[in-house]
């Protein structure tokens, strides 16, 4: 019991005190709240997710979510009430843009049928579709299907882009920003969601690109094996200037929250055989075509494209462990 109490105290420990006039803004992405436990996880995933959200809410004045707060757009009343209880406890702190999982068919006019829309309508969450000001800073949203040409240019290089976009993803160019886009747009910082993998910061002219990765680990991608769970904190006194830092959220090692089979598979990938890149898999899957009579068999299509057997086996296993039908 004492050990459990210590863990809880460590998890909710406040950050180092800052001067009272400093506002702290947390940026996270791809929370993927879900009611059903991912098959690869051995813990109570929903509770783990809510604990992370409470941690960032307690340690920051505001929390900005760069898309995909929920894993599916329409959830049960029980899940809504559970999330509502947490968000209402920290009412006024939550800001978000929509991700592709948050809405029905990416339709922003269907918020009344989405769980995230319910949070918005009861006043627990601010959803943003236009630039908004927060603590003297301007944040500009870009959704997954926003054309980069429609994103306003930051001529003064002082604003912050919050986008649910890949970065130069050849599999999904319509859902991506490129380095040329970033140079043209001219934002001081650009935070991208959508891609769950964490990357090092990159710099394009005067723009700092941040792709921190998802707040949660929901699958068996190899990058989930050893990575830290983090958020970015922006600190400002309200004068338009700010500083930022990468902050680690308390989390359990993958070996403690994944089932043994999933963890062993993640450990083996890349050790005994060449790691299968999901970008490469995406290039293969993009060649699938729909016909009037139905959808081509994934297995037959992969074999017709001379996909290596070990790659096919890995794709099949990832489908099964995540409860996705493989045909």
Q: Language-model segments: which ranges?
A:
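Metal-dependent catalytic neighborhoods of phosphoester/phosphodiester hydrolases
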Residues: 37-40, 67-86, 103-122, 201-205
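Beta-strand-turn-beta hairpins that frame and shape the catalytic cleft
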Residues: 18-26, 131-141, 155-160, 204-208, ...
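Active-site environment of divalent metal-dependent phosphoester hydrolases
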Residues: 32-35, 71-74, 97-111, 146-148, ...
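Active-site neighborhood of phospho(di)ester-bond hydrolases with catalytic His/Asp-centered motifs
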Residues: 27-29, 63-68, 94-101, 127-128, ...
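N-terminal active-site segment of His-dependent metallophosphoesterases
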Residues: 1-82, 153-155
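Conserved catalytic scaffold of divalent metal-dependent phosphoesterases
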Residues: 83, 95-181
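Conserved beta-sheet core of the metallophosphoesterase superfamily
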Residues: 173-240
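Non-catalytic terminal accessory segments
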Residues: 2-10, 254-327
């Amino acid at each position: 019991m004492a050990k459990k109490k210590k863990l809880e105290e460590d998890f909710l420990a406040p950050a180092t005190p800052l001067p009272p006039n400093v506002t702290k803004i947390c940026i996270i992405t791809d929370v993927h709240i879900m009611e059903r436990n991912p098959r690869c996880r051995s813990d109570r995933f929903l509770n783990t997710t809510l604990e992370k959200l409470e941690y960032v809410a307690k340690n920051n004045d505001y929390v900005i979510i760069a898309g995909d707060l929920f894993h599916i757009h329409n959830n049960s009343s029980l899940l809504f009430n559970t999330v509502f209880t947490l968000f209402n406890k920290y009412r006024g702190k939550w800001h978000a843009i929509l991700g592709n999982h948050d809405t029905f068919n990416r339709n922003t006019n269907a918020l009344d049928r989405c769980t995230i829309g319910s949070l918005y309508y009861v006043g627990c969450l601010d959803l943003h579709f236009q630039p908004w000001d927060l603590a003297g800073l301007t944040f500009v949203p870009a959704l997954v299907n926003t054309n980069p040409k429609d994103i306003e240019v930051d001529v003064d290089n002082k604003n912050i882009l919050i986008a649910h976009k890949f970065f130069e993803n050849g599999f999904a160019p319509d859902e991506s920003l490129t380095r040329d886009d970033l140079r043209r747009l001219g934002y001081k910082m650009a935070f991208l969601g959508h891609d769950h993998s964490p990357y090092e910061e990159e710099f394009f002219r005067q723009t700092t690109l941040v792709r921190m990765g998802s707040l949660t680990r929901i699958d068996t991608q190899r990058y989930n094996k050893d990575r830290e769970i983090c958020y970015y904190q922006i600190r400002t006194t309200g004068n338009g200037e700010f500083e930022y830092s990468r902050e680690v959220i308390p989390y359990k090692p993958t070996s403690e929250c994944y089932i043994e089979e999933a963890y062993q598979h993640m450990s083996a990938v890349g050790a005994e055989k060449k790691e299968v890149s999901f970008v490469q898999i995406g290039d293969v899957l993009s060649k699938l075509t729909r016909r009037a009579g139905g959808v081509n068999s994934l297995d037959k299509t992969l074999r017709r494209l001379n996909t290596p057997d070990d790659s096919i086996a890995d794709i099949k296993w990832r489908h099964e462990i995540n409860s996705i039908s493989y045909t």
